[in-house]
Amino acid sequence: EQTGADSTVRTDVCIIGSGVGGSLAASRLAEAGRGVVVLEEGPFRTPADFSFDENAALPDLYADAGMRSTDDLKFSILQGRCAGGGSTVNWMVMLRTPDYVLEEWRSRHGSEDMGPAQMRDVFNRFEREWNVGPVAAHAHSRANRILLDGCRALGWRAESANVNARECMRAGMCGLGCPYDAKQTAVKTHLARALERGARLYSETRAEHIARNRAAWTVRARSSSG
């Protein structure tokens, strides 16, 4: 959706960004019966819109056409700027937070509800919803097979990464969006469920100002059409 000039939309919850985090929140809140609005600065694209043309895809799907960096220019940041956010343009590797990291967070920051035991069910549910599983052995390239065999010959632990895909065509251009509709993105999973339950998505709409008054929060946003 897009709003007209100077229009007002009322809702229970306004979520800024439609990537993995925003879409998950939208889905859970919509399932709970809340009114949800999702603002997305970038465009809404379908598999039919994707191609392997980097000149077209980078400015369309990435923040700063894929050239975003930290202020000191030490790190580049490949940040999705489209419906689905990074899930639309990432390479699908789905890693669980290691237990030792969760334990460190708990000991340092008191995150008692995010220990390994509690997060196991969270990871399991998310992976079911996103169809996460290991890359099949036959799907590896020759280079990958050599690397796996070499690691195992040295006695090192080596496993196929888990990915979120159905019937992956192994085109090798995941960073430009999946024209085969195999990648299980936020658009296909949590955002789709949120929209089915009445959430509203405003694409090409940038949140510019957030203010709080006595009754509620106000978000001022601007669409690409002004």
Task: Set out the residue ranges of the language-model regions.
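N-terminal glycine-rich phosphate/pyrophosphate-binding loop and immediately adjacent elements
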Residues: E1-W105, S111, P116, A221
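A conserved beta-strand/loop element that lines the FAD pocket in flavoprotein oxidoreductases
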Residues: L195-A207
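Cysteine-cluster motifs in flexible loop/terminal segments that predominantly coordinate metals
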Residues: R166-T189
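Rossmann-like flavin
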Residues: G80-R170
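Conserved beta-strand-loop-beta-strand element in the redox core of flavoprotein oxidoreductases
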Residues: H209-G226
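Anion (oxyanion) recognition and catalysis
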Residues: A30, R152, L195
